[in-house]
Amino acid sequence: MVNVLTLADVSGEGRFAGCTLGVDSQSDKWWGEGDNMVWLDDTNSPALHGTGTEDYFGFAWCSVDIFNHPFRGQTMVANTPHHTIANMHRYHLLDTLPFQKWGRFQFGALGNGMGKMDWSTSVMWYSMNH
């Protein structure tokens, strides 16, 4: 079974400008690797399809390093053998993702089969509805 976390599903004209993601995983397994997918308008496949959660936010290989760059970062990690809490962000200020009719922002297969996981998200977008 594949889990999908939908961060935003909006109608009308607009632009995605960024998101934050927080995870509270009560497992000793890596919580990431869910592909990020941005669906725009009437596409049959994602307009943006990434390779993994950590890649989208600017790090790799299950890193617990804290960093904060102008457009992406992992600003908090608390890691014990059976529990991880992490917060990250990415801003599309120079590469917004425009849509005319609707847009959907998702991460797929997050923590698939790993037990209890809590997620917190926020998505920033500009609405162009007239």
Q: Which ranges hold each PLM region?
A:
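Beta-strand-centric surfaces of beta-sandwich/beta-rich domains
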Residues: M1-H130
